[in-house]
């Protein structure tokens, strides 16, 4: 996909790579921005916090971290498996600029991305509150759909529901 330099690989590695890319751009005086997406369950990984600490230390204001905060991971609800909440307060404690949004509201997302571009001297974290599978009755807020693709019948049923919205 054009503009996507890499997939994240194992949990926690994406943000580490993003921090490296953002730092390299700063050192090269390149004004490109780096965006990375984390799952809330992924924030259980220590590497996420090491990378965040580095991003803040190096004042990587060209880095925007978007956290998909849906409280679901492959083995259960994040707050029951190993709670990482409150995410916003944790990222603030690591000296990041934090913006909380409804992850299903495009206007809020656009405004947050604009605010991130305008923030200087620190990385921005957008904590996007979402509902996994939103808009598809049999997928919505269901842990079992984590990492599972729908079969053809399920796909058509899901698309029918989404097109009706």
Predicted segments, located by residue:
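Glycine-rich ThDP/TPP pyrophosphate-binding loop and its adjacent helix/strand module
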Residues: 1-165
